[in-house]
Amino acid sequence: MSVNKVILIGNVGQDPRVKYFDTGSAVATFPLATTDRGYTLANGTQIPERTEWHNIVASNRLAEIVDKYVHKGDKLYLEGKIRTRSYSDQSGAMRYITEIFVDNMEMLSPKGANTGAGAPQPSATQAQQPQQMQQPQQPQQQAQPSQAQPIQDNPADDLPF
């Protein structure tokens, strides 16, 4: 058994290029940047920030969504597979390119953050919004009964941190 699964959260480096074919299928390509923060080791050594650029490929329905809603600077959550292909350049040298073929995408940028204020988001993002709204409400509902209980019975006091 083997697993080929990639999960990325990053920023779109340039507006996607989308090609539509006579068959009705579409392919979108764009670069995505992921950045590891810089930090300082205990001995004072500075580790600089590091940015990786990933070649992203989306096809069919995802390519259409990318065409309509994804722009340079947008923050995306992507799931997909990594693939490497090769080709010969003009001088005959063999070149290799590694790409991420997207299976799932979630837009993390707020509506209208980078382009056209009020631009509609794809349905996948709209489906996420109600879940995000419910999550803050659940802890509030749980917190109300625990406030009514005596402090010694509060399970939050038993936390190890």
Curated annotation (Swiss-Prot):
Domain of life: Bacteria
Domain SSB, first and last residues per copy: 3-109
UniProt xrefs under Pfam families: SSB
UniProtKB keywords: DNA-binding
SUPFAM superfamilies given in the database record: Nucleic acid-binding proteins (SSF50249)
Ranges of Low complexity composition bias in the record: 119-152
GO terms for biological process, alphabetical: DNA replication
Chain positions covered by the region annotation Disordered: 109-161
A Gene Ontology term for the protein's cellular component: nucleoid
Signal sequence coordinates: none
GO molecular function: enzyme activator activity; single-stranded DNA binding
InterPro entries tied to this protein: NA-bd_OB-fold, Primosome_PriB/ssb, ssDNA-bd
Record keyword Isomerase present: no
Assembly and binders: Homotetramer.
Protein name in UniProt: Single-stranded DNA-binding protein
Organism listed in the record: Bacteroides thetaiotaomicron (strain ATCC 29148 / DSM 2079 / JCM 5827 / CCUG 10774 / NCTC 10582 / VPI-5482 / E50)
Taxonomy of the source species: Bacteria, Pseudomonadati, Bacteroidota, Bacteroidia, Bacteroidales
Gene name of the record: ssb
